[in-house]
């Protein structure tokens, strides 16, 4: 299982003094061997543990299995909370600490999910993907969000410098050229009539003139990621949130790393 490769990853992260947050699903915390690996790293103070909830593999199993219900934000609020609570308690039992960081599976996050995790004592969410909409997958639209950390207000609208209780640390996503917000607005205009039929946004992206980039070794080369980092710094962004799935640690476990050669290439990306 890919989680069994975590010691190799952790050794690399330790070389750079990086303390990662491992966001755990219900199947992981029900696997004694996986928990043993994680507890050893956690006990050494080398990582934090948080919560990553996929509805389809987190009890109670009451909803029909379909694409719509794979987004946590689409479930009834009570069922959302029950799943979150079960996963939260399983992590707390295994690690003797209450997790405070959360990411919704498939980025399925909204105000109701935020309220539910606040009820459970979470202080950090990292479910927002700036300049990205999941509407075609029955998910949320984050196209108006920036990668800048913010605090949710009591009405759960992201506003920076508020003193309310849930911090949003978005995945680091931005553009390689120009002001991020201006690029996002231009992309939005190009997707509407009369421009949408010409697919200008896709053309400009391929030419790297309007390219959106994730800070993720699953999706980008080290050179492209470093270009994004430089853009972030030049625009005053002070925090980076690099993301990837643990399935990338084992060839054949996911769509991004399909072979042992891909696996070795992925680790080289991280080292670079």
Predicted segment positions?
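Active-site-adjacent pocket scaffolds in enzyme catalytic domains
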Residues: 104-233
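CE4/NodB-like, metal-dependent polysaccharide N-deacetylase domain
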Residues: 10-15, 19, 76-106, 161
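Active-site and substrate-binding clefts of carbohydrate-active enzymes
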Residues: 208-272
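Short glycine-enriched loops at secondary-structure junctions
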Residues: 53-59, 245-247
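Hydrophobic faces of well-ordered beta-strands that scaffold small-molecule active sites
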Residues: 20-22, 49-53, 100-104, 124-126, ...
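Generic structural signal for well-ordered alpha-helices
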Residues: 6-10, 35-39, 81-88, 114, ...
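Surface-exposed, active-site-proximal loop segments in enzymatic domains
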Residues: 60-74, 252-258
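Active-site beta->alpha N-cap acidic-glycine motif
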Residues: 1-44
């Amino acid at each position: 299982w890919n989680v069994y490769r975590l010691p190799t990853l952790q050794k690399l992260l330790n070389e750079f003094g990086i303390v990662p947050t491992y966001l755990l699903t219900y199947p992981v915390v029900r696997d004694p061997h996986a928990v043993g690996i994680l507890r050893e790293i956690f006990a050494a103070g080398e990582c934090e543990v948080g919560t990553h909830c996929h509805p389809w593999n987190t009890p109670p199993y009451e909803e029909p299995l379909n694409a719509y219900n794979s987004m946590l934000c689409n479930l009834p609020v009570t069922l959302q909370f029950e799943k979150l609570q079960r996963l939260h308690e399983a992590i707390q039992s295994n690690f003797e600490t209450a997790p405070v960081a959360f990411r919704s599976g498939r980025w399925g996050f909204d105000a109701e999910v935020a309220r539910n995790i606040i009820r459970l004592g979470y202080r950090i969410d990292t479910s927002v993907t700036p300049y990205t909409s999941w509407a075609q997958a029955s998910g949320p639209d984050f196209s108006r969000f920036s990668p800048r950390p913010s605090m949710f207000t009591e009405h759960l609208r992201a506003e920076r410098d508020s003193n309310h209780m849930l911090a949003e640390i978005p995945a680091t996503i931005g553009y390689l050229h120009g002001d991020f917000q201006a690029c996002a607005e231009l992309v939005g205009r190009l997707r509407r009539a009369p421009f949408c039929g010409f697919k200008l946004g896709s053309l400009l992206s391929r030419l790297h003139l309007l390219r959106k980039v994730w800070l993720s070794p699953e999706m980008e080369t080290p050179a492209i990621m470093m270009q994004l980092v430089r853009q972030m710094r030049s625009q005053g962004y002070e925090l980076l949130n690099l993301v990837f799935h643990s399935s990338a640690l084992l060839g054949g476990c996911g769509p991004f790393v399909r072979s042992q050669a891909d696996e070795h290439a992925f680790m080289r990306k991280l080292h670079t």
